[in-house]
Amino acid sequence: MNYWLMKTEPSVYGIDHLAAEPNRTDHWDGVRNYQARNMMRDQMKLGDQVFLYHSNCKEPGIVGIMEVVREGYPDHTAWDPESRYHDPKSTPDNPRWFMVDVKLVRPTRRTIPLTELKRFPELEDMPLVRKGNRLSVMPVTAEQWDFILGIE
């Protein structure tokens, strides 16, 4: 099993939106970065665990735990001219972007803020806490996962 962190802006699609979905499950669409796409397409597997992270908000931090319930498949929002994620270079025959389906397992007991995560030497190699990392999808080691659950 692999571990991940996926960022979202709560004003666009946050934990409350996912919790309100049927079966607390939805597709994770709109990722438009090749490195993040490759992780979703090639590395995310059924059962992988994912931290849900709220970004671009008053208190950025980890707010929930999700599970990958469908492996990577073409992101249909790229083909929709009305979608904010439309990409005219992506087609059903030659998809450029991929998504996975995730299910909300549970909210974390509290928001675990980025400011707190940055204080722990155990997390210094985590991409989230390194300067300049803007990826919306990133790997988390098993040790980092367990440590974060321990401070929850």
Where are these regions (language model features)?
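Aromatic- and Lys/Arg-enriched surface recognition patch
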Residues: G64-L135
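Short, charged beta-turn/beta-strand-edge "cap" motif at the junction between a beta-strand
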Residues: Y53-P60
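Long terminal accessory segments
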Residues: N133, V137, D146-I148, E152
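A broad, low-specificity signal marking well-ordered, structured residues that form hydrophobic/aromatic
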Residues: Y3-W4, D26, M99-V100, L135-M138
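Compositionally biased, charged N-terminal/linker segments
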Residues: M1-L46, Q144-W145, E152
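Hydrophobic beta-strand signal
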Residues: F51-L52, E67
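Hydrophobic/aromatic beta-strand segments within beta-rich folds
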Residues: L46-F51, V100-V102
